[in-house]
Amino acid sequence: MSTQLRAAEISDIIESRIEKFGIKAEERTEGTILNIKDGIVRVYGLRDVMFGEMVEFPENTYGLAFNLERDSVGAVVMGPYEHLEEGMTARCTGRILEVPVGEALLGRVVDGLGKPIDGKGPIDTSETSPIEKVAPGVITRKSVDTSLPTGLKSIDAMVPIGRGQRELIIGDRQTGKTAIAIDTIINQKHTGVKCIYVAIGQKQSSVAAVVRKLEEHGAMEHTIVVNASASEAAALQYLAPYAGCTMGEYFRDRGQDALIVYDDLTKQAWAYRQISLLLRRPPGREAYPGDIFYLHSRLLERAAHVNEAYVKEFTKGKVTGKTGSLTALPIIETQAGDVSAFIPTNVISITDGQIYLDVNLFNAGIRPAINAGLSVSRVGGAAQTKIIKKLIGGLRIALAQYRELEAFSQFASDLDEATRKQLEHGQRVMEILKQPQYQPLSVGEMAIIWYVVNNNYLDQVELKKVVDFERSLLSFLRDQHQDLLDEINKNPNYSEKIIEKIKAVVEEFVKTQSY
């Protein structure tokens, strides 16, 4: 005999089935592609889209909403767009662009969206972070007070860089801008500073050469390389610096120190100009859009030295008593030494100083070709290593006087003894400032070299033998007095006791060694 269900039971069964029925309703605004040209997609609809929101196209392709007009949206496609056609559907995602962050990225080469391109497999990280963030406020910042040694004598002596500073490297093409940045990254091997190198609009071969050099010198272990090469879409060249900055902020916000190199921001400005003109935004000076200053200011303001309270709040109390820093070394390429052009003046006004590389010095064999007269560090002086600060004394003034005398001596036939000595001393200082690439020096080595310069030991050395003298001195120190170098590196403060030790070692070298 079959059992019949009562009406109440039927209604209970239906109710329980409805409750168990799992369906997620997802509301998305859709639009239709009107046209595609040069990586710019115009979409009809998408009434709820936000500026900078990711827009989804068919075949897992994404774009960024840039122009919000009355009936349509102008979006820039991130990557290939040949498969997109008019009439296809575009959807809002409700998300802004995020990139992977974390320790797992160290030692890897990624593209402008954080995807690995070095053939070493996927990156083992689940953490992501938005590429656009608000820079830390004034209250959460700390003044720059800790040195970031570059290992280059001329920079650490005359234009010192501190952790959390923004120091511009500016000069014509082929004057050694990238070389300074790479040497600085190599020098962070034993400092614990994590490095991010962002290559924008460069040849693939140039980036490969940089990666190879970093690997040769054991610097790739603490470095992330972000590459948006010249062959990639303008959108990726525009986004790469922000992606690299987000990766650096991961370390800064957790009480660590990071260094980021943007090589170079001129190419990013070109990419943004291209996007803006294709979106038919009104052009301004040099055809750049009106918000080109904001492009770089919002990026470089994110480099900062943040205080303990900021780190503690960000990590929810997991990290206490530590400050974090992100130091930026943006690079700008000038045309025929014109530092008064639009982009160079913009970035000079945003940064905390600049290192100006002179093509004439470079061609004269003075490398790194730093023009001490035009280079300045506005906040790094407070962070300079104490012993170096004391030993260099009036180096800048001495060099300025030497250049003045050098110009004068070309017209004067006979010079008095004092002028001749000053000229000869200046020539020796210029020789000492020369430094081969990929050979950064420690604080201890630099301190002893500046002691030698300051106390006129070089005046007894022939001009053509100054480089040999320095090479022999460094070799002597590393072989026989490594303990003194270690002592200075560990505690780089000036004291009479340490100066006595340096004097004894230098006297021993001068008496016993040949060069």
UniProtKB/Swiss-Prot annotation:
Its EC number is 7.1.2.2. It is a peripheral membrane protein. Keywords: ATP synthesis, ATP-binding, Cell inner membrane, Cell membrane, CF(1), Hydrogen ion transport, Ion transport, Membrane, Nucleotide-binding, Translocase, Transport. It catalyses: ATP + H2O + 4 H(+)(in) = ADP + phosphate + 5 H(+)(out). One of its GO terms (cellular component) is plasma membrane. The record marks 375 as: Required for activity. InterPro entries: ATP_synth_asu-like_sf (IPR023366), ATP_synth_asu_C (IPR000793), ATP_synth_asu_C_sf (IPR038376), ATP_synth_F1_a_nt-bd_dom (IPR033732), ATP_synth_F1_asu (IPR005294), ATPase_a/bsu_AS (IPR020003), ATPase_F1/V1/A1_a/bsu_N (IPR004100), ATPase_F1/V1/A1_a/bsu_N_sf (IPR036121). Produces ATP from ADP in the presence of a proton gradient across the membrane. The alpha chain is a regulatory subunit. F-type ATPases have 2 components, CF(1) - the catalytic core - and CF(0) - the membrane proton channel. CF(1) has five subunits: alpha(3), beta(3), gamma(1), delta(1), epsilon(1). CF(0) has three main subunits: a(1), b(2) and c(9-12). The alpha and beta chains form an alternating ring which encloses part of the gamma chain. CF(1) is attached to CF(0) by a central stalk formed by the gamma and epsilon chains, while a peripheral stalk is formed by the delta and b chains. This is ATP synthase subunit alpha. It comes from Coxiella burnetii (strain RSA 493 / Nine Mile phase I). The lineage of its organism: Bacteria, Pseudomonadati, Pseudomonadota, Gammaproteobacteria, Legionellales.
